[in-house]
Amino acid sequence: MSETSSNSPASGSKEAVPKSLAGSTSNIPNELFVGPDGRPLSQNAQGASKSSSKVVPQALVPEDDIRAVEGILNYGGSNDNRPVSHTHTFVELQKSHQNHLTENDRNFGTSRLDDVAPNADGVRRLRTSGSSTGLSNAPPSANVSKASSNLSLASLAKTQPERATPEVCVPLNPDTGSVPLIHPEQTDRGLPYAPDEKFHNSGSLKLPKGASLEDLSRSPSRAVLNEDGNVDECAPPEPWENEYNEVLDDVENAVVGTSPLEYTSKPLAANRQRSTADLTESDNICGLTAGKSDPVTDVDESQTIDEQSIPEAEKGFYTKDGEGTAGLPFDIVSNLDIPNENAHESSRSKKKHTGPSLSSASQPSAASSSSSSEPSNLDKINDVKKNIEVSANEPQPRPVKEDVPKSQVGGETDTTDVINNSTPKEETEESPSTELPETGKEQPPNKAEPAVPTEASSTKPSEAAEESTPRFSVRPNKFTGSRAGFVAALESRLQKGPLMRSFVPNKSKSPSGTKSPASGETSEAGVKETETTTSSESALPDARKSRARGPVRRPPTSVNTKPSFSVSGIDVFLNLPQSSVMKKKGVETRKEVEPKEEAVIPEEDVEVEVETEEQ
């Protein structure tokens, strides 16, 4: 090649490759000029190309290779035929929710791949970027001169090129079937293809040479003269533009002093006024009157507002949790007490709990909690079941007669409902019975199956804690529990709507009384403190929080808000397979079944021990 380069005159190469062509190709980095035989030639040595009439710039990499590589990238090179136009690349799938963006605005020259996998695009870009002059869109079989590459899989050659997706995101004009030229002004239209524009975006057009100041002051649709002095075609003024122009003209005239604007100190005619006073229910759409249909009294200026006073909480349309209620004012829907729902405790129930019972009952739980951590999942399930049965069987106003059977039921009932309805006198009666399990530790309590006394006793104290503390072992589904109670709550709400309570989340992160003995005492103390503070705070609504500011978000969920009964995948994964392995080895399996010394239902325990003996 070096010899030929020395022989061939510089002029010859200039004739062969006109500047315009070379320029048009320049943005494809690895592109060379290819002679008629299909071999790449360097710019200097073009002796061979003189014989050919025209020199066509072509990609260095033959198109079949590009197609093959692209196919392998997109479809993993599999050999079966795919309808190429309908198969989405994984990249297209990635981006598919944004397709309308990519195709329509500002990105016309850019392939979809660019934002997702900028480098993956290198090969593909060769085909269509800049000048597609030499790269034929004809089916590869038509170019006989090119040898098809060894790379390409036969299945990937595009048999129907017109149906193949164009690689660059300029969509075809459906009418012409051609790639439209795109003028920069049109880029921001939201159109799927670039139309011939009769109406230009007059904002982005260049001004004609003779433009005068008044032309500039007109609204965008006023006629602008083009260089010939003729009026440009442009979109007819839209109705708002006319109004706008009239107003502008009025203002300009008023400034000049030609015609004064009519001006009165009177605001609007009474019938056109929208006053605060006479809003009716029909105005309530979109929360305009925020639930008040009664006229708002005018401000009396003689009254001073004393700074200490706390404004009455405004009624708004949003529930504490931020769902919009369907147009019902706050005091009907605000914070319903749904029976058995104890996730967020009201200040009322907290006040009820602080009493002699709390201090007395918390001690045993703290002492014995070393032996027991939270009752096992099975226990919790039973809890839920009993809860549901109990609450379904009982009429809403609950008699206090429950205190007696509690020892048989095993204290599984959700006690807070009882406590809420009972008076402090009854609470003091409860506290001795709560301490019972501690004193009678060795005797098997009367459960249905007293098979394993130690375990039953280890379950007891945590129940005692449950009775005395505002923490609940089980949070059943929001609407579980007596339906009647729910309706009753609704109806009582309808008669006397309480003001909105500002919601104070429970400060103690750990469920109290269940942790290790050391943490048990501290958490009890903490609970007492928070209870006293919250009861004093929530008596008066906080002035800052009482304004209704649209949907209030619920505070971030803390440990005690989460349902305490949940099986995570990891628990299952860790416990079950391990236990089976241990069984095979013949090792005692009790540890596996009961990893944290949790309480286990007696029947199951017996079965497990039997199994180990057999093996």
Swiss-Prot record:
The keyword Phosphoprotein applies. Residues 600-615 have a biased composition (Acidic residues). Residues 312-323, 586-599 have a biased composition (Basic and acidic residues). Residues 1-61, 97-149, 181-217, 266-481, 493-565, 586-615 are annotated as: Disordered. Keywords: Phosphoprotein. Residues 1-11, 41-55, 128-140, 272-283, 505-522 have a biased composition (Polar residues). The modification Phosphoserine is found at residues 149, 152, 219, 275, 516. It holds the Pfam family Aim21. Residues 356-376 have a biased composition (Low complexity). The modification Phosphothreonine is found at residues 276, 297, 514. The keyword Transcription regulation does not apply. One of its GO terms (biological process) is actin filament organization. GO terms for cellular component: cytosol. This is Uncharacterized serine-rich protein C18E5.07. It comes from Schizosaccharomyces pombe (strain 972 / ATCC 24843).
